[in-house]
């Protein structure tokens, strides 16, 4: 699959989607995007900047949601224009899809909306590549139905059917907890779509702090190493210069100062993983 001018897949080095969870300020977006651009350029990692203009799924009604669609997209457009970076944001409504598609390069669907057929059809007909997140409640093999819906909708609209990615972000495991079943990364390949691992939301503890979600950011390196060892097309990571002060998902954000060291380790693993054939593809024969 071609994404933002580069090839992605298991025959390519992993690409990275990264940035702050939510648009907090123009300065934070520009500074973080600039730092990430420097890091990924030095390592040769294809990079897409991400941030959300609205966090519609919050633990509490008083939680910070973002600057809103108009202001948020304006800031993301500036990142794209001044830093020359492709940009991704998530959408929650059909109106969001229409407006965001005018600005960003890649759209993303929230995990909780993966079974909403009309929504998936609408985003699939936006004309943009889409990173479709697997719901925390969904079996990995059920993502084939979701991807098939998107492809059918794209075909109806006369659009390419290979513009979709399947993203793993953990599975609910009791109350306020998620686990990552690494088998899911191999199972989701059966969708025929490139598989992306969301390394930061996978360590989230949903609602674990009462009115906010908790997280175990120290487990991001652990799970991201495991995912790269399995073999993925891309990685998704939220990052912040000061996670303790982040206005959303700080407990599971990668400290920006540690991003380069983490990516260096993951690059080395990725090269080993993709050097030879994936034996799981032949064990049944």
Swiss-Prot record:
It catalyses: D-arabinose 5-phosphate + phosphoenolpyruvate + H2O = 3-deoxy-alpha-D-manno-2-octulosonate-8-phosphate + phosphate. It is found in: Cytoplasm. Its EC number is 2.5.1.55. One of its GO terms (cellular component) is cytoplasm. Pfam families: DAHP_synth_1. InterPro entries: Aldolase_TIM, DAHP1/KDSA, KDO8P_synthase. The keyword Transport does not apply. Keywords: Cytoplasm, Lipopolysaccharide biosynthesis, Transferase. SUPFAM superfamilies: Aldolase. One of its GO terms (biological process) is keto-3-deoxy-D-manno-octulosonic acid biosynthetic process. Pathway: Carbohydrate biosynthesis; 3-deoxy-D-manno-octulosonate biosynthesis; 3-deoxy-D-manno-octulosonate from D-ribulose 5-phosphate: step 2/3; Bacterial outer membrane biogenesis; lipopolysaccharide biosynthesis. PANTHER family: PHOSPHO-2-DEHYDRO-3-DEOXYHEPTONATE ALDOLASE (PTHR21057). This is 2-dehydro-3-deoxyphosphooctonate aldolase. It comes from Variovorax paradoxus (strain S110).
């Amino acid at each position: 699959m071609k994404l933002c001018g580069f090839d992605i897949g298991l025959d390519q080095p992993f690409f990275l989607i990264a940035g702050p969870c939510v648009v907090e300020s123009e300065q934070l977006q520009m500074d973080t995007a600039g730092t990430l651009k420097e890091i990924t350029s030095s390592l040769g990692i294809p990079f897409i900047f991400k941030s959300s203009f609205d966090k519609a799924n919050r633990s509490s009604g008083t939680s910070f949601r973002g600057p809103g669609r108009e202001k948020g997209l304006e800031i993301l457009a500036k990142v794209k224009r001044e830093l020359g970076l492709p940009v991704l944001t998530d959408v929650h409504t059909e109106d969001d899809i229409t407006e965001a598609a005018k600005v960003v390069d890649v759209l993303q669907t929230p995990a909780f909306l993966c079974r909403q057929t009309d929504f998936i059809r609408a985003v699939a007909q936006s004309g943009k590549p889409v990173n479709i997140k697997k719901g925390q409640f969904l079996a990995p093999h059920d993502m084939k139905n979701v991807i098939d819906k998107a492809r059918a909708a794209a075909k109806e609209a006369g659009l390419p059917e290979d513009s979709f990615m399947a993203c793993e972000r953990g599975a609910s495991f009791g109350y306020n907890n998620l686990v990552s079943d690494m088998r899911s990364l191999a199972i989701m390949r059966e969708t025929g779509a490139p598989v992306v691992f969301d390394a930061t939301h996978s360590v989230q503890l949903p609602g674990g702090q009462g009115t906010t979600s908790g997280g175990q950011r120290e487990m991001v390196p652990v799970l991201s190493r495991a995912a790269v060892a399995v073999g993925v097309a891309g990685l998704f990571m939220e990052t912040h210069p000061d996670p303790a002060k982040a206005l959303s998902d700080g407990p599971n954000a990668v400290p920006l100062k540690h991003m380069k060291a983490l990516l260096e380790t993951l690059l080395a693993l990725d090269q080993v993983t993709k050097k030879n054939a994936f034996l799981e593809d032949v064990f049944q024969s």
